[in-house]
Amino acid sequence: MTYIVIGIDGGGSKTHAMVADEQGRTIAETVGPGSAVRPGRAEHSANVIAEVVRDALASCEMTHVTPRVLSIGVAGAGRETERNELWQALVSRDLAAELVIHSDFSIALDDAFADGPGVLLISGTGSVAFGRGPTGATSRCGGWGPVCGDEGSGAWIGRRALSVVTAAADGREPETALTGAILTAAQINETSDLIGWAANAAPAQLASLAPVVLSVADAGDLRANAIVSLAVEELVLHVRALARHLFGDERAALPIALSGGMLSRGTTLRKRLEHRLKSAVPGGQLRTDVVVPARGAVRAALRILGEVMA
């Protein structure tokens, strides 16, 4: 009998599922809406994940098959309370024989470095850094959520842009091309309308403004460039903190991997970050291959499958 497993990467803006056989060969992939778990919102995340699992099985005509292991890495699940709430919301749905929930950063670290040392920096809707030192010890930095932290993330950049636009409307900041660009992206006509828009905006909606900020920065706008520069510095601080904590020195030789939509290859944020890391973390060895967190979730599922079948 051939067994299948499913690996899930659930972020704030999208959820990526990979179906694989017991040898780890990819059978199908699908993408759905964001499923990041927020306090008190586990049912919503579970609904999205369940739908993505069904879509993934349908895409490879395996709706009649029960996956042996469903391995889920989801933003917000680094906190035990939210992780337990999500597990409770999912376990009754009988999506798989075995269900395991990880943080999004742990599955990404697995894909980036397997069992080896390194620091992974993620910037998507939110941001977090996670690392493993030479001794095997692990630690995280950031990931405090959209209200308290997530510095250098898409949502954080979007919030900073709103502050700049409203300050420019007051005359506290110089005029900026961000004003027109942000109003257009938010599909509103007046700066005053931003109050209502922002009050109802989810982190993913704030993050949708980040590409606009990067585009305006590329066109030479000083305020947009200042936001991007500050985002870079905030992200660098995450890496430096873990370098000190796990490797003893921010100048130590350490592998670094970048992940998340804001740090996709070719983005302005990634290019500036790569340049800054050369001086800020001189011992850093930047990985150029693409990190696929869902693939890390599949790898975790295969380990569990091996234990179950042993």
Where is each model-derived feature located?
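ATP-binding/phosphotransfer module of carbohydrate and carboxylate kinases, centering on a glycine-rich
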Residues: 1-65, 111-117, 162-310
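Conserved phosphate-binding catalytic cores of ATP/NTP-utilizing and phosphoryl-transfer enzymes
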Residues: 1, 97-120, 137
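Short, active-site-adjacent cap segments at secondary-structure transitions
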Residues: 78-80, 107-109, 128-129, 264-265
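Glycine-rich beta-strand-to-loop/alpha-helix junction loops that act as flexible
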Residues: 71-77, 123-125, 254-265
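Short beta-strand-loop/turn "lid" adjacent to the catalytic site in phosphate-handling enzymes
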Residues: 38, 56-95, 100, 110-113, ...
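Glycine-rich phosphate-binding loop of actin/hexokinase-like ATP-binding domains
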Residues: 116-172
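Glycine/charged-rich beta-loop-alpha catalytic/anionic-binding loops adjacent to active sites
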Residues: 30, 68-70, 90-94, 136-145, ...
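Active-site nucleophile and cofactor-binding loops and adjacent substrate-binding regions
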Residues: 99-107, 122-123, 151, 285-295
